[in-house]
């Protein structure tokens, strides 16, 4: 697991996690960048680490806006990684 994927999983595992890619970018403190975050989340979705859902957007185009939630598999992978360093997911 690389640091960018780890950052996204940590942010999604918080008690009140950011769910939209733009919120993830903002809360990462500059670690996640705009174009790469969308590719990262799609790759993590393919691996089964996050679930992708859609919500109706109130914008002028009436499009659906994707949001992401960490899966059990993603949480287990994160906990396993943190255990190697003696850390616990709170």
Locate the predicted segments by residue.
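Short amphipathic alpha-helical interaction segments
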Residues: 31-46
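Accessory beta->alpha helical hairpin/"wing" motif in late/C-terminal subdomains of nucleic-acid enzymes
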Residues: 69-75
